[in-house]
Regions:
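Short coil/turn segments
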Residues: 1, 9-12, 58-60, 83-87, ...
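Extended ligand-binding regions for polar small-molecule ligands
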Residues: 18-27, 88, 92-106, 178-216
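Periplasmic-binding protein-like
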Residues: 75-82, 154, 158-197, 215-227
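Extracytoplasmic small-molecule ligand-binding "clamshell" domains
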Residues: 1-57, 65, 127, 191-192, ...
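Ligand-binding cleft/hinge of the Venus flytrap
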Residues: 6-7, 21-30, 107-128, 157-161
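A ligand-binding cleft/hinge motif common to bilobed small-molecule-binding domains
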Residues: 41-44, 57-66, 110-113, 137-139, ...
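Extracytoplasmic
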Residues: 15, 29, 48, 64, ...
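Alpha-helix capping/helix-boundary segments
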Residues: 41-42, 87, 106-107, 133, ...
Length: 227
């Protein structure tokens, strides 16, 4: 999920989340082992102890009671993207259109729930397990729009020279955090939250995010999020 977590050319896990995790856990006295998982099985894996935490640009909104959370450590904008020449300019213009989202994500939840008054009745909402399918479908014109993290869309546009346009009005502005199981009583969530604060204060967060994204400050304004 670039730029947060992905494999480099030599198949080494890298990205914003990998760098933050490595630094934060090192400060707490732990070494990090990155496990690539089936995202749809994430809750079962963390509850069973197969993994210690879920960490990959994971939005906290609406999931506050499902896990013990560390963070938020960054701000995320969930957005709608269309082809540059599309006549879709606002969320209201999505009426009757075909939307593709990644399964088990906040955009899927938002569009399937149909409770956001800003969003009209769509023609169809398609879900895919593979995020890259979204981009291919939009690129080929098989869907009218996709919805995802703004940073992921921007990364794809940069890497693949895709001629997409992001709607100005975001679907959701939320914090992203690290999820631990509710039955995890080790206190790692609280320690990690404190470590995040220290890393913001000493400039480490800005340095890490700035390696991957321009204007890193806007992604670190977690204190501005509504409680």
């Amino acid at each position: 999920y670039p730029p947060f977590s992905y494999l480099s050319n030599d198949s080494t896990p890298t990205g914003i989340d990998v760098d933050i995790a490595t630094e934060a856990f090192a400060r707490m006295g732990y070494a990090v082992r990155i496990e690539i998982i089936d995202w749809e099985q994430k809750t079962k894996l963390v509850e069973s102890g197969a993994i210690d935490c879920i960490w990959s640009c994971f939005s906290m909104d609406g999931r506050e009671q499902l896990y013990r959370w560390a963070g938020p450590y960054m701000v995320s904008r969930q957005v709608v993207a269309v082809n540059a020449q599309s006549h879709i300019e606002t969320l209201a213009d999505l009426a009757g259109k075909t939307m593709m989202v990644q399964s088990t994500t906040k955009p899927e939840e938002i569009f399937l729930a149909g409770t956001d008054p800003r969003i009209p009745q769509l023609g169809e909402v398609l879900s895919t397990e593979n995020r890259s399918v979204q981009y291919a479908m939009l690129n080929c014109g098989y869907v009218d729009a996709i919805a995802a993290h703004e940073t992921a869309v921007l990364q794809y546009m940069q890497d693949c020279n895709a001629n997409f346009r992001i709607l100005e009005e975001p679907l959701l502005v939320t914090g992203i955090g690290v999820a631990f199981a509710l039955n995890d009583t080790r206190g790692l969530d609280e320690q990690l939250t404190e470590t995040f604060a220290a890393m913001r204060a000493d400039g480490t967060m800005k340095q890490i995010v700035g390696k991957y994204l321009p204007n890193p400050e806007k992604y670190l304004e977690v204190d501005a999020l509504e409680p």
